[in-house]
């Protein structure tokens, strides 16, 4: 089975790229390596409150979809973007000196089953503080987390969890699943237990642990304005919540692992590694099977997990033992109506929107998987809503936007659920159920139309189900092919140079100059300006946008295409990096000055055209 990282093309991983911008990658690598060796960490606040870490947190939060969502103070990332860089850094550093979190705004988000999920939205400043903490804690925790914990972790996804399930079912012949649903997990996390678990992971900075305690106990403002003061639970919606939930359940991962796969043996058996870097412990497992131990493997994605067993008897004992362990160790209860032992030769077991079963094929069993019933209902509702939006547009442009949104919904569902082996049955059935609605609501659907080059032509161009509306293509709901779920290559790791080489192309710029840029702020300029200046340096490969010469310290001008006094902004699209000589020439109006810099720069025709475009935007006449 191929792994998702076995590609010749290595894309730029945005989070790794941001870390490189602020020269923190080697620091995070060192934290990971030290944690792997079992070292403890007593002074993390200094790193969290460093200028580089704060700027990295700003950049990361700025790129999040939720950055425009206000907290109780009604402020968003836009309010911080206009602050001077130095003032912004001092503001965040002040939080670490004496932290007092603001109340969290409660928002109810509808769930597919008709119920709502409570989200806690911290203020934008508290989100920046949480991001500063997350950036430092993540490499420490990554070194301690289990290989089959897949949720909210770098370079891991639901695809890896499904691949692990399929392997355990089909290759390792574990046909019994223990399905345990933790009742209200995020609302019932014990704060004291969580702090002790962090201490056990080596996070022993007492000031940091006090800050996290205060975050957990931050008042919650309900939609009706009332305040509640939580004594347990981690608010969903916080930046740190996913990491904290993984810390809580990490103990479960290793407890299940200790019952079988990591059980010590008297004799030290040899292990080898396959092409993906996974340990092959067949000799050890053969010896363990001669004992009275129960064979079990856990696959987890956030608070959703399954334990796979070889026999019904083992599965029942594992169910009871895990239920008791969760209650005694973590203070968590399970939902009796949702928790059960399943023989997957006879019944489906649901996980992450899929339902999986084993069926006999010749002398062996193979995995058969579909979209779960809930997933089908949810998909139908999403597509139906997208169809209705196309039917009643305000104008032709609005209809085009609605069609794009419809295509985005359908393609997104295809991408996620194509891991199901029988997805080519599920989506045609879904299409059939929506056929009447489409024909009634979307009058004018036709087979005739022209596909431009791109994603839709590449993936759906051969489909006879493809339809057009006013010349715009609509992705066919029923046209989808299954794809094997691919394992994560074990060597892939954001916090080792070798692991990053598998997935990420390094910055092709002079890092010394980039560090100089980072550490030499422009006075009286906003944090947005400073952040975008560094992004531009990487995007332009460290070269002048006009002459192509290498940009060097003290010879870099960050030019506003449309001047601020003419309504320009500090946004990325309005900035360009040039040498100081070019920058002066863009704004020069005296003939003597213009001739001086033209002589110095010796621009060719193409370079002069680029320069004149910038002069025109700046309100200065073109140079003949």
Identify the meaning behind each predicted range:
Residues 527-557, 579-581:
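Short cysteine-rich loop/turn motifs with clustered Cys
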Residues 217, 223-226, 330-395, 410-411:
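A conserved non-catalytic segment of reverse transcriptases
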Residues 430-434, 440-524, 602:
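Extended C-terminal regions of large enzymes
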Residues 1-86:
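Non-catalytic, polymerase-adjacent accessory regions of viral genome-replication enzymes
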Residues 1-2, 377-449:
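Right-hand nucleic-acid polymerase module
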Residues 181, 548-580, 588-594:
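Histidine-centered nuclease catalytic patch
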Residues 88, 96, 103, 144-148, ...:
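Conserved polymerase palm-domain catalytic core
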Residues 565-573, 585-624:
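Polybasic, low-complexity binding patches
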């Amino acid at each position: 089975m191929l792994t998702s990282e076995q590609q010749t093309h290595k894309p730029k991983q945005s989070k790794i790229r941001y870390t490189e911008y602020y020269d923190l990658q080697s620091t995070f690598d060192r934290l990971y390596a030290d944690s792997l060796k079992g070292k403890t960490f007593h002074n993390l606040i200094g790193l969290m409150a460093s200028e580089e870490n704060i700027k990295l947190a700003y950049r990361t939060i700025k790129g999040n979809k939720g950055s425009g969502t206000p907290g109780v103070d009604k402020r968003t990332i836009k309010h911080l973007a206009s602050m001077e860089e130095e003032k912004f850094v001092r503001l965040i550093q002040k939080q670490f000196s004496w932290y007092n979190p603001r109340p969290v705004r409660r928002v109810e988000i509808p769930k597919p089953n008709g119920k709502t999920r409570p989200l806690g939205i911290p203020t934008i400043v508290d989100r920046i503080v949480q991001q500063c903490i997350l950036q430092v804690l993540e490499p420490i925790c990554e070194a301690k987390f289990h290989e089959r914990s897949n949720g909210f972790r770098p370079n891991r996804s639901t695809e890896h969890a499904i691949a692990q399930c399929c392997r355990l079912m089909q290759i390792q012949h574990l046909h019994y699943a223990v399905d345990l649903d933790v009742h209200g997990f995020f609302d019932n996390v014990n704060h004291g237990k969580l702090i002790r678990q962090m201490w056990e992971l080596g996070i022993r900075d007492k000031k940091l642990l006090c800050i996290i305690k205060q975050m957990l106990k931050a008042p919650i403002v309900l939609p009706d304005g009332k305040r509640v003061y939580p004594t347990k639970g981690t608010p969903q919606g916080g930046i740190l919540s996913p990491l904290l939930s993984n810390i809580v359940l990490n103990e479960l991962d290793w407890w299940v692992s200790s019952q079988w796969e990591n059980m010590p043996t008297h004799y030290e058996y040899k292990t080898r590694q396959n092409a993906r870097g996974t340990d092959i412990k067949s000799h050890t497992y053969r010896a363990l099977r001669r004992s009275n131990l129960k064979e079990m493997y856990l696959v987890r994605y956030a608070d959703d997990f399954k334990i796979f067993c070889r026999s019904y008897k083992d599965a029942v004992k594992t169910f009871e033992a895990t239920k008791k362990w969760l209650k005694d160790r973590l203070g968590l209860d399970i939902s009796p109506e949702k928790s059960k032992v399943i023989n997957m030769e006879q019944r489906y077991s649901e996980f992450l929107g899929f339902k999986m079963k084993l069926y006999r094929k010749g002398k062996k069993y193979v995995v058969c998987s579909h979209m779960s019933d809930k997933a089908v209902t949810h998909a139908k509702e999403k597509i139906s809503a997208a169809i209705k939006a196309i039917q009643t547009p305000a104008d032709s442009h609005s209809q085009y936007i609605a069609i794009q949104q419809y295509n985005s919904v359908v393609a997104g569902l295809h991408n996620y659920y194509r891991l199901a082996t029988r997805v080519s049955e599920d989506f045609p059935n879904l299409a059939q159920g929506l056929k009447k609605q489409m024909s009634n609501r979307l009058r004018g659907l036709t087979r005739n139309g022209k596909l431009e080059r791109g994603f839709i032509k590449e993936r759906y161009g051969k489909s006879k189900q493809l339809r057009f509306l006013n010349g715009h293509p609509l992705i066919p709901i029923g046209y989808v092919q299954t794809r094997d779920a691919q394992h994560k290559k074990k060597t892939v790791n954001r916090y080792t140079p070798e692991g990053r080489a598998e997935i990420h192309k390094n910055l092709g710029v002079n890092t010394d100059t980039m560090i100089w840029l980072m550490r030499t702020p422009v006075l009286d300029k906003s944090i947005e300006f400073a952040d975008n200046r560094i992004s531009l340096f990487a995007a332009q490969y460290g070269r002048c946008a006009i002459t192509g010469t290498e940009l060097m310290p003290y010879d870099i001008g960050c030019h506003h295409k449309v001047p601020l006094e003419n309504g320009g902004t500090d946004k990325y699209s309005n900035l360009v990096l040039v040498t100081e000589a070019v920058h002066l020439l863009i704004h020069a109006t005296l003939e003597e000055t213009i001739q001086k810099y033209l002589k110095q720069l010796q621009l060719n025709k193409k370079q002069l055209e680029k320069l004149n475009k910038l002069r025109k935007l700046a309100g200065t006449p073109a140079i003949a």
